[in-house]
Amino acid sequence: MLKTNRSYIFFIVIGCLLFFSCKKEPQTESPTEDLSVSMLQKVNQLRNTGCMCGSTFMPPVTQLQWNKQLELAAQTHAMDMYSKNYFDHISPTGTIPIQRAETAGYTGTYVTENIGKNYTSVDAVMTAWQNSESHCKAMMDSMHTVMGAAVLHKYWVQEFGKE
């Protein structure tokens, strides 16, 4: 009986040690995954219903697909704007959206870019872009078939393209 009790105590102690010594890794999605889902969903909702872009009605158009190369181009541009403290479609070295997309491996034929700064959520930046005629028209352009986006320190970038 004493030997059985010692065995139980031994396994309980070992079990407790293992339980308390193992660290669980946090189960969170990366911001990129969250952004890709919510941004693509918001843009496609807009494209599904059509909308007013300034004084021009933009009719419904086909949904976009997510493109990892355009996402990388958006990430690169957001990082560049943040690290070099500028806000423009053309970098201080003269790089334009199509060049950034090609550098990221994008092989499509058409690239349009929206940028935003100091917005705190996808909803906020989407509202701002929808209220700007040129940004709204970029999101509604029927030539676009794919998109990628990124945010870094409140620098938002959308890249649209045609594959």
For the regions a language model picked out, list residue spans one by one.
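C-terminal motif of bacterial Sec signal peptides marking the signal peptidase cleavage site
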Residues: 18-21
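Bacterial signal peptide processing site
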Residues: 23-26
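Bacterial N-terminal signal peptides that target proteins for export
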Residues: 1-10
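A short alpha-helix/helix-coil micro-patch that ends at or immediately precedes a cysteine
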Residues: 28-83
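Short, hydrophobic secondary-structure boundary micro-motifs
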Residues: 56-57, 89-91, 138-139
